């Protein structure tokens, strides 16, 4: 068992990538990450940790760790981390985060120690969680970019894997020419004729039908001169031969170079001796020999943009040699295609009669207006209206009427009228020839001219002096003065003011004085009197005199109520005789002198009441003049129905002797608030003369007295309650 553990341990250690010394974290510990990474790491660290663990599991399974499509929230890893956060006070989750950091560091060979990972996981747990997730995302993204195949170059033999063409699609021909068809044409050799012998002219051409045959040179005697020395020789650096050879090797031709070659050849083919054929033109017809038959003097070809681009050097050989040369070789026509022949500019204008023989090249062209549209060159020639001085002519063959032979497999159809008109104007502006148009187009031009010459309403300048509307308003002074105000001119001479007091109309004198309040028509007559308005004389004002007129004294004010309070009166307030002084504030109230108060209830100060002084509470005595307690007859408790003391035969209570007994109703179960010694017992012997009938009469009288006293007591209590 130990051998198996020892054998598996080196394998696990060797499977980990070694630590690279310079391999450090690509993400800083304090990198905030994306917008939601920082809040998730602080408030939902379990979710951030679960995402990182899920990415590591995808790497272990060989899947894309950046694809979280199958990730499920609230997985077991998330709940486990949540339990460590809440139960271990973040120490357990910090250790868990440190172990995850160590795992990531060992996987990518990042330098560091496990102790540092644990420390950062405990004390910087959100930062460690963000760095772990960002590190995996960045390293795996860089790895995927490095594993992509390199882009395939788009060469001549490249074919796309998928080529979807819609119905009716017609592909454009490729801008290439098969190798072997283009052959460089050598320039004529420079030769000097010997004395007395005619100059020989060498012409290099291709035989028709033998496109791949070598060049054949033919010598023809030159009459009346010798061949001009051309600057475009094979020995010239950057000349056409070098360019042609390079193009032959490449087999391509740009549209700009093709257009430049065509323009240069069209300008020089009538006066230039040499290879004027455009060998790079895509055509199915075999090339022909081109030799000029013009009587014009021989001159060197005019350098084109191709020459300026590839051979910028100009030497003394570029000077023109004006030597007439005659030749019987048929003229060559440049062929754009098999169906159409494009005439040159000289051929087009040679067919147009000169309407102005006296004009020169420097004179501006005289052309009528050319509105409307033109037809194709295949239409009948245009005619001039009857009576016109213009000579009938035929429309020239316009270059715009022919198709291009470089970008389309089919010839172009009928060109637009605007294109023909533009081309015709461009051609006409280069020559003093006159081109006419049809009658309908001439009438349109005349109509446009008439409309342009028609007088308009607003053509003449506007003169303010001729405007009759400006004479109605007289000139007025712009300055505003109150004494001559124009707005008051409509008022009658005698302005009137309305007096609201007398309700009469009083005329105001018209005085040439300064404008003031007393002259204003809107001010009442009362305002004209410059005097103070007394408040006393105004019967419409009922307000009292203001404080500024007289001083207000409280002693004279009979309407001020004196506030009543228990505090002593303030000085000055007692002068008001309408407020009586309450007697309660003058002397204290003695309850003993109040005859209306019956036996009061016990007060807080436990005031002792002398029952002997209260003659109304005494019981009438029997057999005595004065009766009651004053007569000296003892009071028996057994006769008192309101006293809750247990009736004992041997206990005779004497009220006269008990001067400290508390007053008030006593309940049968009431107890004395303070324990005190019982009064001395006095044994009173019954009178021998007292019979049973006398005792019953006395008891009845005592009950009646108690009944009356009870009514008085209740009435006194009601009065005391109302007063309080």
UniProtKB/Swiss-Prot annotation:
Residues 304-322, 550-560, 637-657 have a biased composition (Basic and acidic residues). It comes from the Eukaryota. Transmembrane segments: none annotated. This is Uncharacterized protein NCU10291. Residues 682-691 have a biased composition (Low complexity). Residues 227-245, 270-296, 403-413 have a biased composition (Polar residues). InterPro entries: PLAC_motif_containing. Residues 1-23, 166-477, 496-517, 532-691 are annotated as: Disordered.
């Amino acid at each position: 068992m130990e051998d198996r553990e020892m054998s598996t341990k080196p394998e696990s250690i060797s499977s980990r990538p070694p630590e690279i010394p310079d391999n450090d974290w690509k993400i800083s510990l304090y990198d905030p990450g994306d917008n939601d990474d920082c809040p998730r790491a602080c408030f939902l660290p379990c979710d951030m940790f679960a995402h990182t663990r899920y990415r590591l599991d995808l790497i272990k399974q060989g899947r894309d760790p950046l694809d979280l499509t199958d990730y499920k929230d609230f997985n077991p890893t998330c709940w486990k981390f949540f339990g460590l956060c809440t139960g271990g006070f973040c120490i357990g989750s910090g250790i868990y985060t440190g172990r995850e950091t160590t795992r990531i560091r060992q996987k990518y060979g990042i330098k560091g120690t496990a102790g540092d990972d644990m420390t950062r996981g405990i004390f910087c747990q959100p930062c460690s969680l963000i760095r772990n997730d960002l590190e995996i995302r960045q390293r795996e993204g860089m790895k995927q970019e490095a594993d992509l195949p390199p882009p395939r170059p788009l060469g001549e033999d490249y074919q796309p894997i998928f080529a979807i063409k819609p119905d009716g699609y017609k592909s454009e021909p490729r801008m290439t020419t098969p190798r072997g068809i283009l052959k460089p044409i050598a320039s004529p050799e420079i030769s000097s004729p010997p004395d007395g012998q005619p100059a020989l002219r060498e012409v290099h051409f291709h035989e028709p039908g033998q496109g791949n045959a070598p060049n054949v040179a033919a010598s023809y005697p030159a009459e009346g001169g010798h061949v001009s020395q051309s600057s475009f020789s094979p020995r010239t650096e950057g000349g056409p031969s070098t360019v042609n050879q390079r193009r032959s090797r490449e087999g391509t031709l740009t549209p700009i170079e093709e257009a430049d070659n065509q323009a240069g050849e069209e300008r020089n083919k009538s006066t230039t001796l040499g290879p004027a054929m455009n060998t790079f033109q895509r055509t199915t017809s075999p090339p022909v020999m081109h030799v000029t038959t013009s009587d014009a003097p021989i001159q060197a070809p005019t350098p084109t943009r191709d020459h300026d681009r590839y051979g910028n050097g100009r030497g003394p050989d570029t000077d023109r040699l004006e030597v007439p040369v005659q030749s019987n070789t048929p003229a060559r026509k440049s062929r754009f295609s098999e169906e159409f022949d494009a005439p040159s500019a000289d051929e087009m204008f040679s067919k147009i009669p000169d309407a102005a023989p006296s004009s020169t090249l420097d004179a501006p062209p005289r052309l009528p207006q050319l509105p409307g549209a033109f037809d194709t060159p295949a239409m009948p020639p245009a005619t001039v209206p009857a009576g016109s001085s213009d000579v009938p002519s035929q429309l020239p063959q316009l270059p715009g009427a022919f198709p291009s032979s470089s970008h389309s497999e089919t010839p172009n159809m009928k060109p637009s009228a605007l294109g023909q008109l533009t081309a015709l104007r461009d051609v006409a502006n280069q020559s003093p020839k006159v081109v006419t148009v049809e009658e309908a187009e001439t009438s349109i031009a005349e109509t446009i001219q008439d409309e342009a010459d028609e007088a308009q309403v607003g053509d003449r300048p506007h003169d303010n002096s001729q405007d009759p509307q400006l004479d109605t308003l007289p000139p007025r002074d712009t300055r505003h003065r109150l004494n001559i105000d124009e707005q008051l001119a409509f008022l009658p001479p005698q302005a009137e003011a309305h007096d609201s007091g007398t309700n009469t109309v009083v005329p105001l004198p018209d005085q040439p004085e300064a404008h003031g309040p007393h002259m204003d028509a809107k001010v009442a007559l009362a305002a004209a009197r410059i005097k103070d308005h007394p408040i006393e004389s105004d019967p419409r004002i009922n307000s009292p005199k203001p404080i500024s007129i007289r001083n207000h004294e409280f002693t004279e004010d009979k309407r001020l109520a004196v506030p009543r309070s228990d505090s002593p009166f303030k000085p000055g307030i007692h002068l008001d005789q309408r407020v009586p002084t309450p007697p309660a504030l003058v002397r204290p109230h003695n309850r003993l002198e109040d005859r209306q108060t019956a036996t009061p209830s016990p007060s807080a100060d436990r005031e002792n009441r002398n029952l002997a002084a209260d003659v109304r509470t005494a019981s009438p005595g029997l057999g005595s003049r004065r009766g009651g307690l004053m007569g000296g007859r003892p009071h028996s408790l057994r006769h008192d129905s309101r006293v809750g003391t247990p009736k004992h035969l041997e206990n005779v209570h004497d009220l006269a002797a008990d001067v400290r007994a508390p007053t008030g109703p006593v309940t049968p179960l009431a107890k004395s608030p303070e324990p005190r010694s019982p009064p001395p017992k006095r044994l009173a012997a019954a009178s021998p003369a007292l019979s049973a009938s006398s005792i019953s009469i006395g008891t009845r009288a005592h009950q009646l007295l108690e009944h009356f006293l009870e009514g008085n007591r209740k009435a006194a209590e009601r009065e005391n309650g109302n007063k309080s």
